[in-house]
Amino acid sequence: MNVQNRGCIRRLSFRTLRAAWKRNAIAVIAIALTALLFTSLFTVALSINSSYETYTFRQIGGYCHGTFKEVSEAQAQAIAAHPKVKAVGKRTTIGFLDTGVFAKVPAEVSFMDDNCAAWSYARPQTGHAPKSGKEVTMDTGALKLLGVEPKLGAQITLTFTVGDKSQTAYEKTDTFTLAGWWEYDELSPVHYINISQKYAQAVQAEAAAAGLKPFRTDLNVMLAFPVDIRGQMERVDSDLGYSWEPDGGENVVRIGVNWGYTSARLGESVDVATVLAGIAFLVLIVFTGYLIIYNIFQISVTGDIRYYGLLKTIGVTPRQLRRIIRWQAILLWAAGLPLGLLLGYGVGAGMTPVVMARTTFGAGVSTVSTSPLISLA
């Protein structure tokens, strides 16, 4: 039987499995259960981390990776074109409200582009973003404080302070048309009141005539890889000839890192002991999984040793025997692994709210992770 017919080898492997279908069914179930165990474990672990990150993002007011602060138009274009930057979102703040009904939670009046609005949880769920004239969008909490019914086209009169905390010029009162709104998040640090770019430019020209410096424009960024966020942003500054230090001269572009990301916190406070503990934990998990799977195949192959010996006596080469066993392993994995991954993800997704309910955050902030690391684990 010293032939090179791979089709014959595959057929023999399949028929060998079918001949001992009860034992192999147990092997498939064992593989599926092992995959379920590790998949559900990693799903819960990564989902807890994702839930914590989302909770922090809501407290901060956004989930962009970081912000290049007070940039000019030329600097914004240069940063957006850098290969480490995947996407950018621009925001120009023209004023604020921090008295009266907004004394507890202040409001910021600003222009946000589509990316910035999405990353800041300020994209209208009803209506559309401000496009022209005196259109405005805000959250339902701000509308309630202003005594305005959420209705498209509603007229809203706002009195806000032009400028920012470092420079204030005068109060301005204007009547806006409500173009959209979104649900208020109790965790949000501010009320975002978004106006159109044309209105922001008009107020900026008015403020410049009154002697104010140009309004602050921040560039929020999403990086290609959310690892070592500060290091990557400093590299962008360095490559473009900017300094992130406040006393770096005229060409300063300061950096703000979103500390809601676990990778950002680890990058700044990582120590050798933490790294070694993490590596040891992963090695333990991988080794445990290896032992479980090894024992499954050991039991399966041991039961067929006599059969393989008979095949060898009639001319099957050691190489062909390895192929037969390899094909059996592939078939068993193909049957058990996808089932275990799907069931494990489902179990993990179902357990996440239960686990989160026993934390200080509660089940209401649970976010099920979809990280590819779950299946790779």
What kind of region is each of these model predictions?
Residues L33-S40, V44, I285-G289, I293, ...:
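Hydrophobic alpha-helical membrane-associated segments
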Residues L46, Y294-I299, R306, I330-G362, ...:
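Small-residue-rich transmembrane alpha-helices
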Residues S13, L17, L36, S40, ...:
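Juxtamembrane interface helices immediately C-terminal to a transmembrane segment
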Residues M1-L36, R326:
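N-terminal Sec/SRP start-transfer signal
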Residues L46-R265:
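Basic-flanked hydrophobic alpha-helices used for secretion and membrane insertion
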Residues E268-I285:
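N-terminal membrane-entry
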Residues L17, V28-A32, V283-V286, R326, ...:
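Residue-level signature of the transmembrane alpha-helical core
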Residues T288-L332:
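Interfacial "coupling" helices/loops that link adjacent transmembrane helices in transporter permeases
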